[in-house]
């Protein structure tokens, strides 16, 4: 567990992820009684903590923490884990695994806000209901690249593990985030996406933003997709404020390097019913309330809405605000996400408009018409707003809602709707618009996230709506809960089955327990054939089905038969329920009201048609692919045998299909599970409801995991780890000094400990423990450590005290010695002779000391050099060791990948074998068909024979008829007429026969064409098979190279094991590895542990080397001190030289005195001898030390040489193993070639069978030709038979025969049509097989690319190792040169020192001469050895140069081969791409031609319509002009009236007093009012006409736009051709990349050569070591000789390889020629494609000219149509005539039959008369017969001529019928156009008539007004005259008054 310092990288999140170190220490030191601490069951809190007070029998008394005393059964009390397991991060590591331990661990971690906890393989998270700082950027950085055990539990850790697994295992991953609604799934999903977007950034430069667009990077877009989907797909529910009301599976795609490549989102089951209905405590989707928040006021104005949610019933049925959500800020985030995701401004406005329109839909009101069932709109204001936002005509929309058009049979009728039906229809349309808009947004986001970058793997994140139990549960809840049921079953199967499979894999005895089947009953109840969904879909098929019938069927089928289906028992006050299902998470009551309508999801097709024509592009696009009942009917009539179209799929069927796809995706990935828990129902932070959490734990499978832990062995440790950790429990069980396998050691260790054998099991690689045993072993280990530490401390203390005592004693003895010596010295200190001795002694010993110093210095320098060399060798070996370890690891990874590739290859081989079996089955079927054809042929031969028999019988009949001709003299004319009629009938029958034969021939030709097409497809399949074989050969080559790498890896394994000193055991492990994969894994892990031990040893050696380096430094310092002393000694020596001469004189004087005092000096001489003996002893010790040092160095050299020899032997062994494996590889290749030859033989046999089929068909055609000849013969016989028409009975017999022949031919025709259908079916099967082969080819190419990438990575790693080795060799060379230069310098210094010593010390001349002679002899031996070494080096250099030349040639050849192979592959790929492109271009050309013809037809119709419209416009303009003129006249009359009115007003002002004026004024006002009404009416009519003209203009504009869109389509096709060209250029770039790969392979071979050179350099180093020792030199010479032998063998092998490469070079040159031919072919095809492209462009340019030509052709076609109509009329008349003649012939036939009978009777009478009449009568009759015969011949000639004329006429009739058919088609097409135009003309005429009627009414009104105006004028004149009269009277009266 990490320390606080290590947790500092997590920043402020550290305390929320792992408990601090202080708390951990306190927990470990806390007093704990494991026998008393427990958990007890409690009714209130489920489980409580307590202490056991007592136990009696099966009863336990427990005292809880709140001072309660409980008496419980023993099975209700559970032991508590030690304190160190408190808040443990992985609950599977607990000592005691049970429910209360899991519950309290989660609770305590939740109380500390550690919301993530591991539970074995998956992670459990608890919703905190508050923000925690655990998702900050520093946390993301801290978790990056961390293993699971290295960091605390977190969703980031799960994500990073999935990412690392994806990169290492090269497998797709998935993260399944499941839990109940409100558990925090959506938040965790966002965090996972945040993590991937942060750690796997693409690394590309940001794209330049387009003006007007704010488009982010791929990471930003992936992150911003979530807010947008949440706004439109999340809503507040009872349990969750931000509940996802749809499921999503987000796939994040990565490239081969782990960088983000792209992403896509799949959504499931959007809850669209929430758009129109919410419960009281819920609300609709967030986007509605975000818009209403008024954060963007422009949206309020744009959508014509208010800011009050209660104004819109669709969004205000529940709550409208959520405390935890700021709708204003969320709106800005949503708007920003739309911009970042690249939506255009038009699309953005369309989204908002449709959202506002959905809100307006809820305000639309309808009412019932009086006395009718019909509904009508209650106001149109809301509909106008909705229509404006959706780009619709509101009146048409309301009409479509109230009176939709329904198809009844083949006609459309208008159906009346009541208010409820209209309301339901409005809600369904609102839901459909919202759902389709949401799905379109998802598709649009996927388009934006698809960057077209290469992607290798993906990580899928699943966020599905959680399990839901509401008061009212409908179909949506059933689908959601069923999804969770399936996911839970997947989880159970994956977690528990894998756990048990590991037991079986490890070889543990285990009875398999299937936990995954616990949910099968509920799943089958829902989805089985007679399950709930099946019954629901069946009911939807019946038109009269109701919810009640659906419920009754459910009860009949499941009630009482399935335990999971129950009758509900709803509590009072809750919603009604119809049935209950027992899910894994609880029992749910479902209400089936409206399920049938929800499942069928019907829409008002009339309104949908308006949507398709909407001016809002987004809305029209959403419903462009909608197919209603009409489309369904038409589709059904065409393809009645197929399934219903997608538009007829029910909601449940679509849901199940998507769910099955999801489960398939999940099964193909490696899943990682995250289980989200709800702590409480009140959303209170920090509070945990025990019952609720336990219910979820039981449902989510956490407790099942505990159950399998109880039964199984949850704790497991590798054998090596167990041995290392628990060896302390009984060290004597594992003997020291000898190697013992970790498994055996673990078995011995456990058997020696007092542990129950049932508590553990031994696997192949691990030891498994029951729950709790590992904790017991830990306690035993702690106790053992305590005792050992106590004992060790006592021993250490005793040892330290003994050392201290020993030092004290040594100090005491040394003090005594010093005291004695000082006393003795003080006694002789002042003795004269002592002074003399002090002076002479240094002089005597100085020369000898100098010699000793020189020798010591030489020895020191030599030892120093040897130490440096040994250090260099040690470092080199260490580097080699590291490189070998690295290569071993790389090869292990490569072996894993190779085994996977081998498995893939085996699977592909099995697939080929299966395809072979299928081909054999097809061959068998063809043989059976051949037999059937032979049977048909035999039947035809039999029929032919029967016809021949019939012909012979007819001939006989004809002979009989010729005999009877002489007897029909009197009835000649009648018989001739009858013969003519019958001959015409026969010709008609023969024509029918000829028609049937022609049809038969046409069917045979179609049959032959189908067979030819089948042959072509089979040839294509054979070509694909050959290509597949080539690719498989390439993959075999790659696999061979990878197998070589495997061999190298195995060899390196053996080298490593030899270095470890256990070669025999390693070889056995290798054999086990080849026999058993599981043992391989165990041995690998064991060896990895041993490698770690070796690594520790190497570390120890490094530490030792550091110590030696320190000693070397100390010795260097000592040497410097000694050199300083030598310098001081030299100075003193110079002084001594001066004093020597003085002393020599004094010596002569003293010698005389010494002779006198010889007795005194004898004691002194003895002392000198003693001192010399001591000095000699010290010298001997020094020499022994130097000899010992040399011996150790020699031993080290010998050991190193032995190790090198062993390595050489190992390399030899590896070479032999490599050869053996290459032989095996060649054998495998031979087997593969055999398989390929078998496949070729099968294909050849298939072609032979097809050839036989063709020959049989040729025979069949020949037989048919013969049959035709026979029919011709029959025709001739029938012509002969026409002469003899007197025998009615035989004629009728022939007619019957003809009818039977016709029936047989029709049967044959039916058989041929059946064969044709069978051939078509086979052709479809062949195309499917071809597609499957193409898919397999694509997958094999993909595998090949993967293998190539792996090979390149391995080669790069190998290159790095080679670079490291070359670096080490260069360092060795540097050391060698340094050593040689240092040696030369030091020899020169020695010679100078020797000269100085010779000059200064004459006494040492003899010694120096001896030393010099010795040095000379050593120099001679050195030179001799150096010469031998040089010779050997020359030999080695020659061999190495030869080998280098051969290697270089080999590399060049390999490079050429690789280049040409790659070019060949690239050319093949280019050829295939070009062929595909040519085929696609041909199809596009064909499509363009068809489109062109359609455009011509449309243009022709549009021109005619345009012409008609222009004529109508001209008519309308004339009418408008006339009305304008009329208006001008009215205006003039109006002005006149106004003028007169003004005059009248002036007159009226004068006579206001008069009462009659008021009456006149009222009349005038009425006149003015009528005039204004007339004017307004005329203005309105004019505006309506203007609008109609505008509408016509818009229609013509739309037609022009349609033409423009077609031209745009042509431009797009041209762009597609350019894109194809770019794709081909990209293929060329890929070929260049492959060329680069081949160059890298060449570099890798060069690196291999460098390794060989490195080995040669190693041999040179061994030769250098031989200079220092004669024995070492001999051994190394022997090694070099052996190596030379090996090199000679290798040279021979290289020569053989050179010959082989020469052969391969010739083959490659031939392949090069073929490839160049193919390249030229591709180039020519490319140029032809470019030419075709130019031609297409020219054709497009000529389209406009051809359009005008087509107009002329259309006029000609009209004339032809008229002619065809007349011809058709004539043909109809002729047909009628022919029918009349046939009826007449029928009547004649009946008459002839009667006359034949009469003639027969008369003939009999004539025969009797002839017998009686005699010879004269016979002669007369004979003459008469002759005349009749001549007349008959003439009549036959005339009949033949008539037949010829009839045939000619028939041919003419056929030609006319064919032309009439073509003309009829043209006429029909023209008639359709005419009908359309006539309908339009009628409409326009109707409008014109209405306009004329209105104009007439206006004119009548105008005339009436004019008439009234004239009357008013007359009245005004009368009034004026009266006024004048009154004025005159008034003047008279005034005059009279004046006069008076």
Swiss-Prot record:
Subcellular location: Cytoplasm, Myofibril
Entry keyword annotation includes Coiled coil: yes
UniProt cross-references to InterPro entries, sorted A to Z: Kinesin_motor_dom_sf, Myh13_MYSc, Myosin_head_motor_dom-like, Myosin_N, Myosin_S1_N, Myosin_tail, P-loop_NTPase, XRCC4-like_C
Domain of life: Eukaryota
One MF term in the entry's GO annotations: microfilament motor activity
Pfam annotation, one family: Myosin_head
Coiled coil: 843-1940
Keywords in alphabetical order: Actin-binding, ATP-binding, Calmodulin-binding, Coiled coil, Cytoplasm, Methylation, Motor protein, Muscle protein, Myosin, Nucleotide-binding, Thick filament
Binding residue positions for ATP: 179-186
Amino acid composition bias (Basic and acidic residues), ranges on this chain: 1929-1940
UniProt record, GO biological process: muscle contraction
PTM-bearing positions, type N6,N6,N6-trimethyllysine: 130
Region (Disordered): 1886-1940
Myosin N-terminal SH3-like domain segment(s): 33-82
IQ domain span: 785-814
UniProt region (Actin-binding), positions on chain: 659-681, 761-775
Domains: entry comment: The rodlike tail sequence is highly repetitive, showing cycles of a 28-residue repeat pattern composed of 4 heptapeptides, characteristic for alpha-helical coiled coils.
Record text on subunit structure and interactions: Muscle myosin is a hexameric protein that consists of 2 heavy chain subunits (MHC), 2 alkali light chain subunits (MLC) and 2 regulatory light chain subunits (MLC-2).
Protein name: Myosin-13
